[in-house]
Curated annotation (Swiss-Prot):
InterPro entries: ArgE/DapE_CS, CNDP/DUG1, Cyt/Met_Dipeptidase, Peptidase_M20, Peptidase_M20_dimer
Organism this protein belongs to: Schizosaccharomyces pombe (strain 972 / ATCC 24843) (Fission yeast)
The organism's taxonomic lineage, starting at the top: Eukaryota, Fungi, Dikarya, Ascomycota, Taphrinomycotina
Gene that this sequence comes from: dug1
The protein's required cofactors: Zn(2+); Mn(2+)
EC number, UniProt record: 3.4.13.-
Active site: 101, 167 (proton acceptor)
Protein name: Cys-Gly metallodipeptidase dug1
Length: 476
């Protein structure tokens, strides 16, 4: 195996420019699932994925999953891409998952470069929307197959593939498909590998064994039939924006403390054993400062910082739709405003209970305002938290592969973000799920100037190659 891997590493380095060009083509497709006008681009990205894998000999198909309501209209959901590479009954079979949609991005948001043009700086940082989340890892799998074909090395496992275009907008339709195909298309899977997380910091690789869940809500406050002149009507009517700000100010304190009654009662108790795990993780407050670009930490030490990032819930305010947000001054009273916020959930929180508690709190606060405006509460989407065991044989495979590529034992960590499909795969297939990151903790997924370091991209491809060879040799 060592000789084969060394040759694979050499060809990956040799084909670096080709692999970067492929990633550049992927980034150039603005596959923003949250923008109805860009939905055709999400479909275009699905076609790109199908084409690239098909060229390498994979059997690919697109599954239509119907329509959904978006911006008041019925919109086709992007197809889910399924694929199979190899069907040798003597080999292990791994199901890989990635997503090909991305978060919204524009120069007006503050990007230093065009977000849909992959730009490489003199430090080897590749900037572009989706570079790390999640087009880089997806292109990494394509490149791993190509490296094997280039050398005529037999791919050591069978690959099943599941790629979606709605991950950044709630993964609508995916859960039903996975459950329907658990004993059909996905029946031969021995394990599942997802590459949609990141290192904790910038220097040491990790394997992720836990994720927080998410419940995303919006509150709509509506009053007049149209926007009003504040000089004419200010002080004479109940203003929707004032009501909304009053409600949102009761959700969370500036120090992160959630103010909604009952939320913290659901959280699993921190045991001494779990508490001690955080002592050995390679992370500093300087890592946090570097990742966020400012010294704005709530807690003074890494231990409490990581605990509140991974194992405690958080509530974040995301924005207000319908309010004036342009440059200059506009003295308008908005007729309708929509406040958006989410709660990251942890063991043992249940989404249904969280929704009930939030709705009760929001309704109670609104009623106390004695406003004549109208309130509407909506749960936009929810996904459960997930915890696995780092002692599973599959995680040992990931550990050995990481050690081979990086020369260091990875930290086993949890992640503050959410990948609801992880729970669905584990529950439906009854197979272990490994989260195998490619990018670093400062990549800025979902933020402006999202990037993926060239070194992580190339070593990530090598990691995928090593992972499948280690997987082929293990006896569970």
């Amino acid at each position: 195996m060592k000789m084969s891997l060394d040759k694979l590493y050499e060809v990956i380095d040799k084909k670096k420019d080709e692999f970067v060009t492929r990633l550049s083509r992927a980034v150039s497709i603005p596959s923003v699932s949250a923008d109805v006008t860009l939905r055709p681009k999400v479909v275009e990205m699905a076609d790109f994925v199908v084409s690239e894998f098909t060229k390498l000999g994979a059997k690919m198909e697109k599954r239509d999953i119907g329509y959904h309501q978006m911006d008041g209209q019925d919109v086709p959901l992007p197809p889910i891409v399924l694929g199979q590479y190899g069907n040798d009954p003597s080999k292990k079979t791994v199901l890989i998952y990635n997503h090909f949609d991305v978060q919204p991005a524009s120069l007006e948001d503050g990007w230093s470069t065009d977000p849909f043009t992959l730009t490489v700086d003199n430090k080897g940082r590749m900037f572009g929307r989706g570079a790390t989340d999640d087009k880089g890892p997806l292109i990494g799998w394509i490149s791993a197959i190509e490296a094997h074909k280039e050398l005529g090395i037999d791919f050591p496992v069978n690959l099943l593939m599941c790629f979606e275009g709605m991950e950044e907008y709630g993964s609508e339709g995916l859960e039903d498909l996975i459950r329907a195909e658990a004993e059909k298309y996905f029946a031969k899977a021995d394990c599942v590998c997802i590459s949609d997380t990141y290192w904790l910091g910038t220097k040491k690789p990790v394997l992720t064994y836990g994720l927080r869940g998410v419940c995303y809500f919006n509150i709509t406050v509506e009053g007049p039939s149209a926007d009003l002149h504040s000089g004419v009507f200010g002080g004479t009517v109940h203003e929707p924006m004032t009501d909304l700000v009053a409600i949102m100010s009761t959700l969370v304190k500036p120090n992160g403390e959630i103010l909604i009654p009952g939320i913290m009662d659901q959280v699993a108790e921190l045991t001494p054993t779990e508490d001690s795990i955080y002592d050995g993780i390679d992370y500093t407050m300087e890592d946090l400062k570097e990742a966020v670009g400012a010294d704005i930490s709530i807690y003074p030490d890494p231990k409490r910082t990581l605990q509140h990032r991974w194992r405690y819930p958080t509530l974040s305010l995301h924005g207000i739709e319908g309010a004036f947000s342009g440059s200059g001054a506009k003295t308008v009273i908005p007729a309708k405003v929509i406040g958006k916020f989410s709660i990251r959930t942890v063991p043992n929180m249940e989404s249904e209970t969280v929704e009930r508690l939030v709705k009760e709190h929001v309704t109670k606060v609104f009623n106390s305002l004695n406003s004549k405006n109208k309130l509407a509460f909506n749960n936009m989407h929810s996904g459960s938290w997930w915890i696995s065991s780092p002692d599973h044989w599959h995680y040992d495979v990931g550990k050995k592969a990481t050690e081979r590529v990086y020369g260091i034992t990875p930290d086993f960590v949890r992640e503050g973000g959410s990948i609801p499909v992880t729970v669905t795969f584990e529950q439906s297939l009854k197979k272990n799920v490994l989260l195998l990151p490619m990018g670093r903790g400062d990549d800025g997924a979902h933020s402006i100037n999202e990037k993926l370091d060239l070194d992580n991209f190339l070593k990530g491809i090598k990691l995928f190659c090593t992972y499948v060879h280690e997987l082929a040799s293990v006896s569970p």
